[in-house]
Structure formats: C-alpha cells, structure tokens
Amino acid sequence: MKHPQNNLLIVKSCLSLVLALSAAAAILTSCSGAGSSAANEVAGDTLTAESDLLTLVDCGSYVVADIKNPWDSTRLLQRYVLVPDSAGNPEGLPEGTVVRTPLRNSLVYSGVHAGAIRDLGAIDAVRGVADAGYFTVAEVKAGLKSGAVMDVGSSMSPDIERVTVLAPDAILASPYQNSSYGLIERLGIPIIECADYMESTPLGRAEWIKLLGELYGCRHEADSIYKEVSAEYSRLATRAASASSHPKVITERLTNGVWFVPGGRSYMSSIITDAGGVNPWADTPDAGSIQLDFASVFDKAHDADIWLIRNYGPELTLSELKSSYDLNSRIKAFENGDVYVADTSTSTLFDDFPFHPEKLLREYILLFLGPDYAGTDKTQYYQRIEK
C-alpha cells in the first residue's frame, strides 16, 4: 500500500490552486445535495424500515440515500446518489451528490464507523482517519503505525494538505447543528453526513449499517448483520417485556452542576424501556438529553433502583461518588449498592452499541431483571461499584 505522507511536500505549492478550481464544483455539489426541503420521491425498492432519518431506495442502476435533517424534519440534510462503477454513467439521475461506489479510499472521522466497516469486511478501504487517538480498530491502529493509514488530525480542523494528498473518494463525518466543514467542503470531495447518532431508537441507528454497505459494496453483508442484530434485539426485548417488575433506572451523575438525563424520545430512554427498566423522564418529548440540577433529579428519582454511570477512568468507588456530592448517598440505588459503572477508557462500549445494540440491551436486562431474562450472568461493560 502506498504511503500518502510522502507526497506532502509536493502538494503544498499547488494547494491554493486546487482550492480555487474546486470551489465552483463544491458549490454545485452542495446545492444539488444538501439543505433542501422535503425531497422529491424516487421510484424503486425501499431498503430501510426502522430508521427515522435514513431512507435508501434501490432505483436499479443506482441507489438514492436521503438523510433527513435531525434538527428540522421538514428539510433534507443530504441526498446522495450512489452509482456503482459497474453501472457506467446512467442517464436521468435525480439531483443529489453523486458518489461512485464501492469506496476504495475513504477518510473516516469516527472509530464507530470504522468498526462497522471492519465488520463488513471493507476495512482496507479506510485509508485516512481523524481524531486517530479514539480509534480502537486493530487494523486502523496498525495502519497508522505503518503509515498505510493517514492521520489528518482533528475532525474539527483537519490538515487540509494531508486530505488533499489522500484524495479520498469520500469523507464519512458526523454532522452537528449549524456547523460546517470549513475548507474541506471546497475540495469537491463528497462528505457523507452520518447522522446515525441522532436516531431515537437502537434499531433505527443500527440500520445505518445498510448505508455503509451500499457505500462499500457490501449490501449482502450489511443486510445479514442487521437481520441478526434486529432478530436478537427483538427477542431479548420481548423476553424483558414479560417481567412482572420493572426497576426505575437513572443514568450518569452531576458534573459541574449539571446532570444530563435521557429525554423520553431519546436513544437511551428507548433501550432502558426495552430492557425492562423505567426511565423517570419517559413522558418528556425530548429526543436528546435534558439538563437538570441535582434537586430536580433527586425529586423525581431519589427512589431509583438502578444507577448506571459511564466513566472514563480511573476506577470510581462509592466513597468517591459520595464525596463528589454528598447527597448522592441518599439515592436508593446508592444505599442498596446497585450502582454500576462502565469504564469507557478500557471497554468497547462506545464502539459496540451503535451497530450492535443487542449487546448493550442484554447487559441492561441482566442488571435490571437478572440472568434468567438475559440468558447470561456475565457483564461485558458494567461493573458494580465497590465501596
């Protein structure tokens, strides 16, 4: 595999020209694919069912991928027209950002997506990454060490020269409200806005593996993975729903005077409910987290049976939890020793749950209802806090 770093000096002298020449093309691309109102319907077979934000339609010689704006459901965030190299140049393509597939040279901003691409068997097509320190995929780490995978720096301000040298077929990024991609947008490289993290249900998010499957020419593999995930998730949720008791569950803790709790339409609320738990804020309309002070949380959830905390090392103890805020010790789960922590510095929790929510669901069922419902007595991510 070539080492693109060797060409950095060559590109410096012509980068300004590249940006100038590509600006017009980038503008045309963005106008045709992004920020429009509700998209015109296209005829074909719909490939998605659970996702609220992603719609894939197979139109025969190409696939249309519509991504709804998570912050304004009346508008389209992006429309991509995925055209296989084997299809040549089909006539009558709908408006949208054209992406030739399969991707063979991609720049990926998130380790979560790299993990899913690995599962599809296409990890060799990941030739560049941003925020390299957060990637745990072994093949990517080895590539970074050997130089086969380029580190382009921070996803918030990637090294434009390195990106130009890499010349990826596409960039996979996570969009944020009212944000832009800076100079990267002027290179004319398709930016695939992976808004999967904004989905409100676990299976809705997991279904985004189908988009990756289309991008990397792995539809069969993506369909197979999603089918297995969906079946296992549904089986576990059905078993949990049959439980006679449902514990009240709180998540995270007070940090800098703010406690983030899951809104009623959030991903976390969905998976807590599916695992047989009760989210105290399940009746709220919020699709994300709600910011509260300690008094508000305590008033509604002081009698919580289970307390789940994600913590990036070092190991957290009950005494440390109490010393960080004394009234933590008056929460029922604390008093009964039912506080569980996932150390995200060592576990693969963040890498696993987006595309394999059945793993997290099984763990929650074990913690909420016990091994008879979970089918296992071993945890993978969470451990009970010691004194």
Where do the PLM segments sit?
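Bacterial N-terminal signal peptides that target proteins for export
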Residues: K2-V18
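Extracytoplasmic ligand-binding site segments that recognize negatively charged/polar headgroups
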Residues: R104, V112-H113, V129-E139, S179, ...
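Second-shell loop/turn segments in exported
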Residues: G96, T101-N105, A116, A148-S154, ...
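Structured C-terminal subdomain patch of bacterial secreted/periplasmic proteins
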Residues: E199, L203-E228, I309-K387
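Bacterial N-terminal signal peptides
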Residues: C14-S30
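A short, structured surface patch at a secondary-structure boundary
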Residues: D66, W71-T164, A170-A173
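Bacterial Sec-exported substrate-binding components of ABC uptake systems
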Residues: C31-A114, E221-I250, E335, T348, ...
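Flexible, glycine-rich surface segments
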Residues: A231, L236-K322
